[in-house]
Swiss-Prot record:
GO terms for cellular component: cytosol. InterPro entries: Ala_racemase, Ala_racemase/Decarboxylase_C, Ala_racemase_C, Ala_racemase_N, Ala_racemase_pyridoxalP-BS, PLP-binding_barrel. The keyword Isomerase applies. It catalyses: L-alanine = D-alanine. Catalyzes the interconversion of L-alanine and D-alanine. May also act on other amino acids. Substrate binds at R134, M314. It comes from Nitratidesulfovibrio vulgaris (strain ATCC 29579 / DSM 644 / CCUG 34227 / NCIMB 8303 / VKM B-1760 / Hildenborough). Its cofactor is pyridoxal 5'-phosphate. The active site is at K36 (proton acceptor), Y266 (proton acceptor). It is an enzyme of class 5 (isomerase). This is Alanine racemase. GO terms for biological process: D-alanine biosynthetic process. Pathway: Amino-acid biosynthesis; D-alanine biosynthesis; D-alanine from L-alanine: step 1/1. Its EC number is 5.1.1.1.
Amino acid sequence: MPISYNKASVVVSLQSIIANYRRIRTVAQRPMPVIKSDAYGHGLEAVGMALEAEGARECAVGTVGEGAKLRKAGFGADIVALLGALDREDAQLAASSGIIPTVLDIAGLERLAAQGTPERPVRVALKFDTGMARLGFTEHDVSALCERLRTLPSVRPVMAVSHLAVADDPTQSAFTMAQGAAFARIMAGLRSNFPDIMGSLSNSAATLAHPQLHWDVQRPGIALYGSNPLRGTALARHGEGLLPAMSVSVPVLQVHPLPAGRSISYGRTYTATKDATVAIIAAGYADNYSRALSGRGVAVAGGRRVPVLGRVCMQTTAIDVTDVPGIATGDRVWLLGGPGPATVSADELADLWGTISYEVLCLLGMNPRRHDDSVE
């Protein structure tokens, strides 16, 4: 549920997301933007509608319910629900909303078949496990699956999907290529029965750096939102030039001196070694600004980077503004993004947080949000 009780401000640049989509299209023939989990915190409906207007032929969401929400907002292109129809209610909703759910097992296939007819079959995407050991059929199930599908004219397989475990790590390329080979064998078996079925294997990293794994439809996710999935690797150049799409700011509650020798916040984990000035900002772990950033995080105040002092509290955090002249109550401080060269990226914040940019964006994006709609 979105956070509605604070004064944080999340601003999402749709123009940046579209620029990233255009960048991806220079290397991908048919990218299917992944906008699951509220578009990684960027706003499902706004992002989906902007991408459809830009020419996306389909988008991928997480759940059928998320897909129905997008459809209700007026999204007219195809929607693939990556978690599939989990129960009868989901199956009914997928059929009535024209959503393409993944199928993970025979029970799920039969659940969806009950909602279609030979004249109006429910379209499905067949999910295969090629190495994640997470969800879906295996390569050994292909023959029996095709045989069962031939007895169910009320469903129509239009796509087969699998997911890569380490496409972002070139030191494990052998595993990635083994997954690709397994998927190729799966597709050969499927196409001997369903010649028109499309294949979708590549995530952001593979979309950018492994064209041999593209198949018919590519599934960029984190790259759409400006994070380079290949950062820090020998393939990092393939993800350069992506634009961050989210900034998060909060107000200053109070500015006061912190004399040398005085501690601050819970646990007294920080004691000033010299006279300082601190600002208490309206952000804490209840606002999805992690307690893991205690004594580690940075923010942007007055165009300068400043450190977090002491422990992050539930709704407040202390920052050192000794070198930020004129800062006052009510001024905005950026936790993510920010004006000028001092901006904090999602990747950098994730490193300080001890996590990945996906989590940073999904969590901070739950705060009060607005969209910059200036898409060119």
